[in-house]
């Protein structure tokens, strides 16, 4: 049996850890809320339309890659107005579908680097979840 005093200490410690975890996860989500990143396959032009927008206007440089194709698309460029749109022509649709063709983006954001990864989707589909990472 746990003594009442020890039970109280354990209860307070458990609640404190829970609060810290919840606050930290909300901070991370809020940190990335200002970014929009999408990759859409345009059937008519057989190309991929990639869009990025940073509503905080702190993005200055990008490294964009489309992996999983016969030849990896790689481009590095300066971003103006913290947004860009790229139309990337492709030779053919991947044999095993778009899930095997991730689009990655590395953004210089203020004093840090933000990494993003998404999947290409058809025009009539909902945008997949964007995975974020950060390096200070």
Enumerate the language-model features and the residues they cover.
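Hydrophobic membrane-insertion alpha-helices, especially the h-region
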Residues: 5-24
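Short, surface-exposed binding/anchoring microloops in extracellular/periplasmic proteins
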Residues: 20-69
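Envelope-exposed proteins and targeting segments
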Residues: 46, 101-103, 114
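A short, structured loop/turn motif at beta-sheet edges
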Residues: 57, 107-114
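Edge beta-strands of extracellular beta-sandwich domains
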Residues: 75-77, 113-122
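Short, solvent-exposed, Trp/other aromatic-anchored flexible loops in extracytoplasmic proteins
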Residues: 78-110
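Low-complexity, Pro/Ser/Thr- and charge-rich linker/hinge segments at domain boundaries
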Residues: 123-136
């Amino acid at each position: 049996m746990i003594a009442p005093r020890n039970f109280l200490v354990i209860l307070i410690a458990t609640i404190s850890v829970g609060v810290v975890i919840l606050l930290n996860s909300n901070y991370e989500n809020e940190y990335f809320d200002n970014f929009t990143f999408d990759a859409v396959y345009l059937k008519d032009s057989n190309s991929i339309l990639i869009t990025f927008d940073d509503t905080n206007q702190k993005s200055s440089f990008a490294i964009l890659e489309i992996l999983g194709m016969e030849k990896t698309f790689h481009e590095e460029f300066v971003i103006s107005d913290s947004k860009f749109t790229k139309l990337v022509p492709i030779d053919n649709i991947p044999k095993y579908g778009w899930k095997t063709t991730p689009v990655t983006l590395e953004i210089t954001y203020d004093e840090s680097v933000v990494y993003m990864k998404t999947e290409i989707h058809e025009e009539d589909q909902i945008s997949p979840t964007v995975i974020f990472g950060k390096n200070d």
